[in-house]
């Protein structure tokens, strides 16, 4: 299982529902008023690529809002959208309130995001966060993995990190650049359809390394956000051990678009000492 944050079609996102719930009201979480003071990042993930600026953040976040609304509408039509007061949804909201104040250091735009957290009844082991802070969890990942609050916080922090680091924006921008560049080259060289095939392969190879780095970055940023929120850093390792048990290790990391479970655990364990004091400070506070 690879945790992704990308613009998904409403049909895929709301499929496989296993619960039916009554209609509910929208739930919004604002980051601005409760934002924590800027703090020095403890994990080292480097800077974001400038190429992402080819895709306007406002445009992408607007598209995300529309897609998110469609996902919720479809889930609601199937009775799969958790109502206000549902115990698992209350858990998610409580965790989100503790994490959101620590998001703005990773992206100043997050101060103005209208964070939303929803729960969809589905057997899928999945959770995601669209640009602009639109989060969805599926009951399958909580129930089947029997996640405690600390482990849920690690998933939520990971998904938030994808949005905060603008991975979807960067992915789309790089895709545009690659498509335009390879298309022009194919025409100039007269490669025709052969050029298109090569272009498709090249796009896959370019995205392979990018996506693996993306996931590692989200793991580490999410770990720090969760630790600052007062959730045990060790829960990140526990989570991925559960993932391995549920899904297998998926082969070596270089054969996947994301790091293998074993590689993720190793990277997380190496970074636990960097955030342990953040958890301790939050626990005392």
Where are these regions (language model features)?
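A Zn2+-metalloprotease active-site environment signal
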Residues: 2-285
């Amino acid at each position: 299982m690879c945790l992704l944050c990308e613009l998904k079609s409403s049909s895929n996102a709301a499929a496989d529902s296993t619960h039916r719930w009554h209609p509910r009201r929208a739930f919004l979480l604002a980051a601005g008023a409760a934002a924590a003071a800027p703090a020095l990042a403890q994990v080292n993930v480097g800077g974001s690529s400038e190429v992402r600026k080819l895709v306007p953040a406002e445009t992408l976040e607007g598209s995300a809002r529309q897609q998110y609304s469609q996902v919720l509408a479809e889930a609601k039509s199937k009775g799969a959208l958790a109502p206000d007061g549902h115990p698992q949804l209350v858990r998610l909201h409580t965790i989100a309130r503790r994490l959101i104040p620590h998001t703005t250091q990773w992206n100043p735009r997050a101060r103005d995001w209208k964070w939303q957290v929803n729960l969809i009844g589905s057997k899928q082991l999945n959770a995601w966060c669209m640009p602009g802070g639109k989060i969805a969890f599926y009951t399958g990942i909580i129930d089947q993995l029997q996640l405690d609050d600390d482990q849920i916080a690690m998933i939520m922090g990971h998904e938030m990190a994808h949005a905060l680091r603008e991975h979807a924006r960067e992915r789309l921008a790089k895709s545009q650049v690659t498509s335009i560049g390879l298309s022009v080259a194919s025409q100039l060289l007269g490669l025709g359809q052969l050029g298109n095939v090569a272009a498709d392969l090249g796009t896959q190879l370019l995205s392979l390394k990018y996506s693996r780095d993306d996931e590692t970055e989200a793991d580490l940023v999410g770990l720090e956000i969760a630790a600052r929120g007062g959730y045990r850093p060790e829960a990140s390792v526990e989570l991925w051990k559960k993932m391995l048990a549920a899904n297998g290790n998926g082969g070596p990391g270089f054969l996947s678009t994301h790091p293998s479970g074993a590689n993720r655990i190793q990277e997380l364990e190496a970074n636990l000492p960097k955030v342990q004091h953040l958890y301790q400070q939050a626990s005392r506070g």
